[in-house]
């Protein structure tokens, strides 16, 4: 049994765990492992937004243009494509890229082809919305959890390997305790989302500044290779409750501290749906994510179902990754997106102060 925290990230703990040292988890789970050369990763959520069906071809082409840019020097080591319909009826194509270090992502994003595409006046006049939500957690600021050991998705795809069975799972509070930084830091949030350029009500280009210790969760489901019984388990038992919980967070986020919640379906380069999905949730703080997870009926039902079936899972793949970030390691930019998009909804403007 291993700790979820890599040996090179372990230090004397000043904050106590929720369980005794003798705790044994009820079933096996694993985490991604990176060597000590990995200091910081970058997660880039690059979106194309449209509303009318006749805009779909242009939106898909814009998504392909973004993906093509990943082939340039210093592009991400891994990426995936997703689709989401928000509660305003807009469709969003989201390209998610992962880099193993900040410098390569900076070189890529500031290269002439990439920077000129995002900064072009065409982005303001082509009838589509675009957004960039880019965050860069340090190695001690993110954690992963997998119910499987091969072909890790998300940030796991840029890690160097997989752990053995880990101790910190199966109890409330284990998510926090998988963060290396949790050994000595409560990860308390401070500040607010603030619009620092543009006006969401007007449109055009808008930039939002984040604050310390915003939390981001990506919680995924992969039933592509599942047999009939596991497909039924996911589609008939897990998904309805999961959808209910995700819709609640999408529509009632401000009441519980959730800035943005998108339950997305993976797609291929032509926009066809794949049998994979995940949730993208931005939270004002990790403790607010914890409070919702531990108290909301929909998540409790999901958690109970997972506990019941986890030990017997074969080809239904469930996982999550959770990160927190310093304010300086976040960029939220929106171009002609509706004002309820992403971090725009809860960001305050100068006029509101």
Swiss-Prot record:
What cofactor requirement does the entry state?
A: heme b
- Noted pH dependence of activity: Optimum pH is 8.0.
Which key words are in the record? Heme, Iron, Lyase, Metal-binding
One GO MF term: lyase activity
Q: How is the cofactor bound?
A: The substrate is directly bound to the heme iron.
Explain the regulation of its activity.
Active when the heme iron is in the ferrous state. The activity is enhanced by reducing agents, such as Na(2)S, Na(2)S(2)(O4), 2-mercaptoethanol, and L-cysteine and supplementary additions of electron acceptors such as flavins, sulfite ion, and vitamin K3. The effect of various chemicals on the enzyme activity is different in the presence and absence of the reducing reagent, Na(2)S, which acts not only as a reductant but also changes the substrate specificity of the enzyme.
The molecule here is called Aliphatic aldoxime dehydratase
Per the UniProt entry, how does temperature affect activity? Optimum temperature is 30 degrees Celsius.
What family is this protein classified in? Answer: Belongs to the heme-containing dehydratase family.
Signal peptide, first to last residue: none
Taxonomic path: Bacteria, Bacillati, Actinomycetota, Actinomycetes, Mycobacteriales
Please tell me, according to the UniProt entry, what happens when changing residue 219 to A: Retains 23% of wild-type activity with Z-phenylacetaldoxime as substrate
Cite the active-site annotation. Answer: 320
Q: What is its EC number?
A: 4.8.1.2
Tell me the superkingdom of the source: Bacteria
Taxonomic source organism: Rhodococcus erythropolis
What job does the chain carry out?
Catalyzes the dehydration of aldoximes to their corresponding nitrile. Is active toward various arylalkyl- and alkyl-aldoximes, and to a lesser extent toward aryl-aldoximes.
List ligand-binding residues for an aliphatic aldoxime: 219, 320
Q: Which reaction does it catalyse?
A: an aliphatic aldoxime = a nitrile + H2O
Q: Where do the annotations place heme b binding? A: 299
Consequence recorded when altering residue 320 to A: Retains 11% of wild-type activity with Z-phenylacetaldoxime as substrate
Q: How does it assemble?
A: Homodimer.
């Amino acid at each position: 049994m291993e700790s979820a925290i890599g040996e090179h990230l372990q230090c004397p703990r000043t904050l106590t765990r929720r369980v005794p040292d003798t705790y044994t988890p009820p079933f096996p789970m694993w985490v991604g492992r990176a060597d000590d050369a990995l200091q910081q990763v970058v997660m880039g959520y690059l979106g194309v937004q449209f509303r009318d069906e006749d805009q779909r071809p242009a939106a898909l082409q814009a998504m392909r243009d973004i993906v093509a840019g990943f082939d340039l020097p210093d592009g991400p080591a891994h990426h995936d494509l997703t689709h989401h319909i928000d509660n305003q009826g807009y469709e969003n194509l989201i390209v998610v890229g992962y880099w193993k270090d900040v410098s390569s992502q900076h070189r890529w994003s500031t290269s002439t082809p990439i920077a000129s595409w995002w900064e072009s006046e065409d982005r303001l006049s082509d009838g589509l919305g675009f957004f960039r939500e880019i965050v860069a957690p340090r190695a001690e600021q993110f954690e992963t959890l997998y119910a499987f050991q091969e072909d890790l998705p998300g940030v796991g795809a840029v890690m160097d390997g997989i752990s053995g069975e880990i101790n910190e799972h199966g109890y409330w509070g284990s998510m926090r305790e998988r963060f290396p930084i949790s050994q000595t830091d409560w990860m308390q949030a401070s500040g607010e989302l603030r619009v620092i350029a543009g006006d969401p009500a007007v449109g055009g280009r808008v930039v939002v500044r984040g604050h310390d210790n915003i939390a981001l969760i990506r919680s995924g489901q992969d039933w592509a290779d599942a047999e009939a019984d596991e497909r039924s388990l996911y589609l008939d038992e897990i998904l309805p409750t999961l959808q209910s919980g995700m819709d609640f967070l999408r529509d009632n986020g401000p009441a519980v501290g959730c800035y943005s919640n998108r339950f997305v379906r993976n797609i291929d380069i032509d926009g066809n749906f794949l049998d994979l999905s995940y949730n993208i949730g931005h939270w004002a703080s990790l403790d607010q994510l914890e409070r919702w997870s531990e108290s909301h009926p929909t998540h409790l039902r999901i958690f109970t179902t997972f506990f019941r079936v986890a030990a017997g899972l074969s080809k239904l793949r469930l996982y999550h990754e959770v990160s927190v970030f310093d304010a300086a390691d976040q960029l939220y930019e929106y171009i002609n997106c509706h004002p309820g998009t992403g971090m725009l909804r809860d960001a305050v403007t100068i006029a509101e102060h």
